[in-house]
Each structure stands twice: as C-alpha cells, then as structure tokens.
Amino acid sequence: MTKQPFYKSLYVQVLVAIAIGIALGHWYPETAVAMKPFGDGFVKLIKMAIAPIIFCTVVTGIAGMQSMKSVGKTGGMALLYFEVVSTVALIIGLVVVNVVQPGAGMHVDPNTLDTSKIAAYAAAGEKQSTVDFLMNVIPGTVVGAFANGDILQVLFFSVLFGYALHRLGSYGKPVFEFIERVSHVMFNIINVIMKVAPIGAFGAMAFTIGAYGVGSLVQLGQLMLCFYITCILFVLIVLGGIARAHGFSILRFIRYIREELLIVLGTSSSESALPRMIDKMEKLGCNKSVVGLVIPTGYSFNLDGTSIYLTMAAVFIAQATDTPMDITHQITLLLVLLIASKGAAGVTGSGFIVLAATLSAVGHLPVAGLALILGIDRFMSEARALTNLVGNGVATVVVSKWCKQLDEGTLQRELAGEGNASSPASDIPVGGREAV
C-alpha cells in the first residue's frame, strides 16, 4: 500500500491550521475574532451526525448480541469503572490545588467582582439537581431527543429500541440490516465532514486567541499551569497505569487517536471527536456493542479532565477570596461533585455550568468568584476535553477486556501501527468507513 504524502494527513493539516489560527489571533485579533463561524460551523456539522450515529451503533450492537445479559454486564462494569476513575480524578484535583495553592495571596473581595458575565452560568447552575438530571434522561418525545441532540436521551431510547429489536428475532432482521446500512451512510457523512476539520480548527483557535489574548493569561497562569500539569500526569500515571495493567501502552494509544486529539484541541469540545472515536475503537478490536454503550455514556459519567478542573477551580476560588475551607468543607465539596460532575456533558462550557451549580449547592463558596476564572476557562477547556477523550478511550478498551469483548491481537497490531488503515468492515460498499 503506497504511503500518502505527509501534507495529506489530517493530523498534519489540523496541526498547521491550529498554528495559523494562533498566529492570526496574536497579530490580527480583530480579523481572528471574525473567524469564529468556521469553528462553530464545524462543531455543528459534527453534532448534526452524533445522534443518528449513536442510535445506529447502539441498536445494532445490542440487537446483534446473543444474550441480553451481556448488555447489563457491560453497563454495570462501565458504570463501576466510571465511578472509581472519576472519583480518583476529583481527589487528585483536590490534593494538587491544596498543595500548590495557586489562589493564595490574591485577596480578592467577591463584592468587587463584575458578575454580569457569569449571571447566565450561575442561573443555569442553580437549576441543576440530581432528580432533574435523572428525569432528563427520559426524553419527552423521541423526536425531541434527536432534535436537541441530547446524548443521554438518545442513548436511553437506543437501548430500548435495540432490546425490542433483539426480542423480535428473525422477524426484526430487515430492520436490523436497514439500520446497519444507515450506520455506514452516517460514517460516510463523517468522513466527508472531516475533510473540513482543518478549517474548523483554524477558526476556533483564531477566535480563542483573538478574543482573549495570550497576554491575559499571565495573571492566572499559575492555576492554568497547575491544571495542565495535573492533567498530563493524570493521563500518563493514572490512565497509563490502568492501560499497562490491561496490556497496552498509553503512549501508543495517544498516538493512535492523535487526529481526534488535534480536532478536540482546536474545538475545545471532546464531543467533536465522538463519531470518529466510535469508529476508531471498533477498529482497535473493541466489540461494537461495548463501544456503543461505553463511549456515549462516558460523555456524561466519565469526564476525568472535567473532574480535575471542578475541584481545582472551586478550591482556587476559595483561596483567592480568602474563604476558609476546612476538611469538612472539602469533603462536602467532594461529595457534591461526585453527583454534580455526572451532569457535565462533553460540550464546550458545560464544565463551567456544573462549577456554578456546585458553588450554589455547597453554599460556603462565593458564586461571584466564577468571574475570576471566566477569562481563562476557555483556555483550560482544551486540557479538560483532551483528558476526557483519552479517558473515555481507555475506559472502552478496559471494559471491553473485562467483558471478554476485546480482540487483543487487533489491539496490539493497531497500536503498533501494523493494522489495516481501512474500515474493519471490509464488505462495506464503495465510500464506506475508510480512514480519512
């Protein structure tokens, strides 16, 4: 197979686009801010296809299973993994921010902060509750779930649909085959959309640098640096340890999903890579049914980067405003976040809304303190989204192995770069899910 020129690689194209976006934002900020529609448009194109892809993947995965017991086992193991790892992430964030104390010495009076820009986040945060979150999983209408692009609602309906289709046996086979064909079409659409990924990454990065400026980061740089280093160490040590214990290298895995990571870096949303992650994890040897359950569910229940951010940001606000936080307050914060963090979907800005909800729920911390980190939240969202993406990928491999639904030979070949670059479904008609 002839190797394509390096400049045709999506990885290289997105990397160059991000670099150009940063340069434009730094030297021509007004022009860069006008590039925002390119980034927004790309994210909207991706989100357009997410709901049908989740539906097709989950339905064909569940309906094609030999036994429904496998679905329950997969879901249970996934939730167990999510709860343990996200709790570890919350604790790590809490420990690091207490040791480094990036907010100490700022002596900010919450009453002097401009809260006008955080009013919408605070209002959205106050509406967050565990009961509302659980009730929101059930869609008011099926059409509404797809129209709004609510991942958990689409997943809920997809599981029910797949279960019902499985019960029909051979009578439901025509429906199963039709949905499988629709799945191939949807992944083809994603392949087409991904051709404009460099433009989307350029627009999003240019806007970010142009709107906020690199210079504005200096004052709060200690928190950002602390957060970025913590995320890197979490990926390499915690996720790396989990990966090593399950027979694969975290560095090779990161290299395997490098294109998806760059797309996320450009858009600041791990959701923008969701369709390709589903495809990539299947190619890696994970069973389709496991991928269909773990990846979408992980976008609400396994956001490791967001978990680290939430504890660090909350305690940073306390330190900066000289709000005392003893061990009881910090344990309360941790318990609140164990619940609240599950509502942080993988979209830009959701982590900030959950942080607002947490400050409101704890009551001890000034919600006005959100204004302190509003300016740098956009820059920290890259590290959150990247960590979330790697975390969900590792979770998929681990749960697949636990459920004995992992082809370990394929896993090692793909991570070593020896796998077939085309889709695992070699019988897909022309235009199938080939690698971009």
Swiss-Prot record:
Looking up HAMAP family in the UniProt record yields: C4_dicarb_transport
Q: Annotated region Disordered: where?
A: 414-436
Q: In which compartments does the protein localize? A: Cell inner membrane
Function of the protein: Responsible for the transport of dicarboxylates such as succinate, fumarate, and malate from the periplasm across the inner membrane.
* Sequence similarity: Belongs to the dicarboxylate/amino acid:cation symporter (DAACS) (TC 2.A.23) family.
Q: Which GO terms describe its molecular function?
A: fumarate transmembrane transporter activity; malate:proton symporter activity; succinate transmembrane transporter activity
Give one Pfam hit by family name. Answer: SDF
**Organism the protein comes from:** Pseudomonas aeruginosa (strain ATCC 15692 / DSM 22644 / CIP 104116 / JCM 14847 / LMG 12228 / 1C / PRS 101 / PAO1)
What gene is it encoded by? dctA2
**Additional facts recorded:** The DctPQM carrier is more efficient than the DctA carrier for the utilization of succinate at micromolar concentrations, whereas DctA is the major transporter at millimolar concentrations.
The membrane spanning regions, by residue number, are 14-34, 45-65, 77-97, 142-162, 198-218, 223-243, 290-310, 331-351, 353-373
Recorded GO cellular component terms are:
plasma membrane
GO biological process annotation, one example: dicarboxylic acid transport
Give the UniProt keywords, A-Z: Cell inner membrane, Cell membrane, Membrane, Symport, Transmembrane, Transmembrane helix, Transport
Query: What InterPro entries does this protein's entry cite?
Result: C4_dicarb_transport, Na-dicarboxylate_symporter, Na-dicarboxylate_symporter_CS, Na:dicarbo_symporter_sf
Record flagged with keyword Cell inner membrane: yes
Induction description: Expression is maximal in early exponential growth phase and declines with cell density to reach a plateau in the stationary growth phase. Induced by the C(4)-dicarboxylates succinate, fumarate and malate. Positively regulated by RpoN and the DctB/DctD two-component system. Negatively autoregulated.
Q: Which residues form a coiled coil?
A: none
The entry summarizes the disruption phenotype as follows:
Inactivation of the gene causes a growth defect in minimal media supplemented with succinate, fumarate or malate. The dctA-dctPQM double mutant shows no growth on malate and fumarate and residual growth on succinate.
Taxonomically, the superkingdom here is Bacteria
Q: What is this protein called?
A: C4-dicarboxylate transport protein 2
What is the membrane topology here?
Answer: Multi-pass membrane protein
